[in-house]
């Protein structure tokens, strides 16, 4: 009998913002509060980096003073209460604090086990930008979608 250290089974494919393993994740609920700025592309879409404001709400990206606390989780339903493809200010959202998630790497291809970075103004995950501590690429995208990757994060 083979010993296993982790019984979380990886899923074969998914969409950005979906949890990629069926156990071993820490997810918390928060209220989203932000001002959408189209020039910054700070859409609160699944797989964006979020920060914790002093009032206990979260917002995509980072202002530089608040702690980054996780990755915005989405699922296969229409994400916003108002039927948009992104979350709106006032929506209750789930944030992955630790675990595995499918994400998009904007602006280039990912390298296996590379550090994950993000863009402060939008919260997009990238291979350049601000460093995300304890965030690594676990699986690189397939030929048909090279920007879709599996990420491991731990913001605890």
Predicted segments with their positions:
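Surface-exposed, low-hydrophobicity beta-strand/loop segments enriched in small/polar/acidic residues
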Residues: 1-156
């Amino acid at each position: 009998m083979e010993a296993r250290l982790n019984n979380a089974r990886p899923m074969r494919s998914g969409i950005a913002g979906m949890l990629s393993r069926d156990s071993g994740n820490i997810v918390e609920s928060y209220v989203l509060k932000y001002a959408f700025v189209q020039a910054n592309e700070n859409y609160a879409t699944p797989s964006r980096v979020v920060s914790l404001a002093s009032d206990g709400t979260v917002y995509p990206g980072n202002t530089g003073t608040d702690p980054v606390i996780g990755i915005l989780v989405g699922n296969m339903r229409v994400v916003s209460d108002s039927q948009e493809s992104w979350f709106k200010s006032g929506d209750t959202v789930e944030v992955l604090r630790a675990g595995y998630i499918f994400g998009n790497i904007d602006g280039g291809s990912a390298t296996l086990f590379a550090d994950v970075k993000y863009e402060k103004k939008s919260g997009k995950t990238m291979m350049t930008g601000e460093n995300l501590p304890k965030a690594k690429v676990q699986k690189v995208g397939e030929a048909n979608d090279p920007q879709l990757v599996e990420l491991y994060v731990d913001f605890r």
